[in-house]
Amino acid sequence: LMVVTSNADRICTGITSSNSPHVVKTATQGEVNVTGVIPLTTTPTKSHFANLKGTQTRGKLCPNCLNCTDLDVALGRPKCMGNIPSAKASILHEVKPGTSGCFPIMHDRTKIRQLPNLLRGYENIRLSARNVTNAETAPGGPYIVGTSGSCPNVTNGNGFFATMAWAVPKNKTATNPLTVEVPYICTKGEDQITVWGFHSDDETQMVKLYGDSKPQKFTSSANGVTTHYVSQIGGFPNQAEDEGLPQSGRIVVDYMVQKPGKTGTIAYQRGVLLPQKVWCASGRRKVIEGSLPLIGEADCLHEKYGGLNKSKPYYTGEHAKAIGNCPIWVKTPLKLANGTKYRPPAKLLKERGFFGAIAGFLEGGWEGMIAGWHGYTSHGAHGVAVAADLKSTQEAINKITKNLFSLSELEVKNLHRLSGAMDELHNEILELDEKVDDLRADTISSQIELAVLLSNEGIINSEDEHLLALERKLKKMLGPSAVEIGNGCFETKHKCNQTCLDRIAAGTFNAGEFSLPTFDSLNITAASLNDDGLDNHTILLYYSTAASSLAVTLMIAIFIVYMVSRDNVSCSICL
């Protein structure tokens, strides 16, 4: 007699469950519920402008030049001469300066308003020690270098801008256009910014100063850029700038940028303001609109939000120019999966046969696995035991960290490479059209969104890899002490309570500690027999004799039935 009993447990691999799912977007699965997320975006609020952390931020061109506009400094007004400190970033705080603080300027006839902004766009700016032209001996001379009471110097005497020489001819006669070469005199390979201009007044003053009352012609040329002007005669009301005297005349001021080694030219008639000291500038930097004073420090300066501290790699809200360690603008909020695909708590189904299917982790997640995302569970007389596999969980976390790093690399390298190309274009044309800038932002936003979608896809799809690895690990540890029954589950030949499961999760499980017969899954026990003096050989003889007799009897009976059915044998029964 044989008795079969089952003391087996089932051990399964699986994923934790959660009651508070989040939603992330993926490339092919759309929106997916997950157990955790890492927000990648923030929406900033407006703040005051600040200094960029770790760098010098330029507000005013010359912080020590009191009562001076940046245009005064750029033109070299006598009372506004000072060093311009180097800076990695600059704030455009004067959008449209109205006066020069010196001789009245016709701002709207040239791009002179842009000169301070141009200078702000360089990290290092210095005024040359020597003059680029000799005004007194220039063609059409000799000249007297004029000064004006409307442009007082530091001793309140008559003065004029340091960047230009007012060339008043000693011989008051008209002249045909003359040309002067403007050499490159910067010594460190910088861009040379040369300021020049011309003066005009009413007819009486024009004849008095220059001997010619007709409109005068002027042309500048540098780096393939040529600009033409014709002076306006008369019609100006008297105007005083700051402490200066009222003036009926006006000056038109322009500038040209000369690259290293390049010579510029100026063609002129009477009333020319010949270039003198030039700006030598190097290290192109971005300039954004903002306001002063600069308060505190910030990671990023943003035209719309002011000073920002970077807490997330991306931001939503208003897109605008920014400088520093800034988050990148994206159209919509982005989240990276930081966990597993959401599964409701699993419910075990009843067995279907001896090796019936179990609704394990593949049909839901297991509660209680608070120390990790992946792990094991056992089911038996002890109930349900759950243990997290920390190594597998750490591998999943490492994958997410790798995705975050990849997104950061995308931000720092690829996207900045695209922005850098646009910045080069910006350097060439000085002002990038807002529509082009918006297109760049849209393109970068789309690239980032796709990268996040693909990252989420990879994180979620990697769950199958982790589960398969866990299953292989579990199979190897259990060895011959268990039978694989599918769906990541194994039927053990021993009991496996919480202690057993914890050892499996820790990788210290030893099947020998739970081996037969102590926890034998199928206990095969011989039937008890009374000892009546028979030895084993006698017992076996009885068994074999009885079995042989039974076999012979059955064969004879079958033969008789066959013969009767063929009418070869008749059978009579007598009572």
Curated annotation (Swiss-Prot):
Subcellular location(s) of the protein: Virion membrane; Host apical cell membrane
Protein known as: Hemagglutinin
Disulfide bonds: C12-C489, C68-C80, C102-C151, C496-C500
Keyword Protein transport: no
Gene3D superfamilies: 3.90.20.10, 3.90.209.20, Hemagglutinin Chain A, Domain 2
Record PTM: Palmitoylated.
Gene that specifies this protein: HA
Glycosylation sites: N33, N67, N131, N153, N171, N309, N338, N497, N523, N536
Main location: virion
Extracellular membrane side: 1-543
Pfam family, one: Hemagglutinin
A Gene Ontology term for the protein's cellular component: host cell plasma membrane
Additional observations: Major glycoprotein, comprises over 80% of the envelope proteins present in virus particle. The extent of infection into host organism is determined by HA. Influenza viruses bud from the apical surface of polarized epithelial cells (e.g. bronchial epithelial cells) into lumen of lungs and are therefore usually pneumotropic. The reason is that HA is cleaved by tryptase clara which is restricted to lungs. However, HAs of H5 and H7 pantropic avian viruses subtypes can be cleaved by furin and subtilisin-type enzymes, allowing the virus to grow in other organs than lungs.
